[in-house]
Amino acid sequence: MSVTLGTKRKEGGIAETARVIVHALIIALVIRTFLFQPFNIPSGSMEETLLVGDYLFVSKYSYGYSHYSLPFSPPLFSGRIWSANPQRGDVVVFRLPKDDSIDYIKRVIGLPGDHIQMINGLLHINGEPVKRERIEDFVDTDENGRTMRVKRWRETLPNGVSYTTLELIENGFYDNTPVYEVPPGNFFMMGDNRDNSTDSRVLSQVGYVPLENIIGRAQVIFFSIRGGEHAWEVWTWPWSVRWGRLLTIVR
């Protein structure tokens, strides 16, 4: 009798544990699909807004949902449901149109119908130069530990959104471009680190981004570790974590 009772209790405990795990996985899947999804920053194309080693939450609900919102992106439907358009200046994660297995994060610069052009390193939207002012240099260290000073600008879009951009070199390859006319239903994306960003200026690699490819809006940095360090090495956190960036709102 006692052996049978003990066996039943053990089986009941295992079943309860399994139910808790299944429920937790379902809740996590719902949150990841419909509310927030974590991403990390692998490159410096959005410096200094986002740094290599930043981990952030992206809101999935900001622009509605497409099949790219779902795990593994099954082509269950086309277009978006509960759709809302990104605004100029939003920092968004999207699937690369040329290879939809790759996620990119950039800033929305051009809306459908806009004309975008770079002239001598200055952004022009619909024929008008975007306001920018020089601010103090961005100071960083290279892979050899040497201090680098990079020109930094504050750029303000026509809707009043301001952010900083970096200028690594003068007369960069994409400092002078033809006029890009953004097609209907598409958006023009650029990185804040203008001379180190493969973005919509490179039509052969990125080009215009359809609304359907947009996954969500970057909201908050929840963790940040210096580039080259590993987040799982918790014993290095006291000196490798960028504590000042934790819970920073992405703007």
Predicted regions and their residues:
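Soluble "head" domains of membrane/secretory-pathway proteins
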Residues: S2-A15, V30, F34-N40, S45-R251
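Alpha-helical transmembrane spans of integral membrane proteins, capturing the lipid-embedded, hydrophobic core
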Residues: T17-I21, L25, L29
